[in-house]
């Protein structure tokens, strides 16, 4: 990230939704989405509003700028480290990519973030715990019901020792409605994980 761009990166500040972490226009506990929907994860926080970092995220995901993961992961540790410390996770788990997309892109952007975050906070990272076994459609143009159907049976537990973990931090690049994080959180809890928290690089605004 060039020095000229650094001042443009403005982290999400209070008030934010106490469940998903989206920036709120006014002081209250929850955004409109979280007031009407029960999430499977326990709590989430995000680093930036998507509109402020959209070009950087595009380059990170689609232009081979894998090194962005180091910078943004370290910023996650710096700005969200207090939250992560309070929830006391056993491990950091990145949201997995489908193997075909991983081959095409060459890297999983969520895993890049998770590795840098783990290094900075001295927390272990488990990239094999959750596997994506279906190539799902892009989520941005789907309604909530279509998002849920799109992700059904898309993830499996990739190891048989998930019960070693009690509290997990999921890491992803973008939070829109939380459907992906909910799907993985529900799967993890079915296998004995008690708490699933989430941190993301960016999200939309709450209403």
Give the ranges of each region predicted by the language model:
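Glycine-rich phosphate/pyrophosphate-handling loop used in enzymes and phosphotransfer proteins
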Residues: 1-207
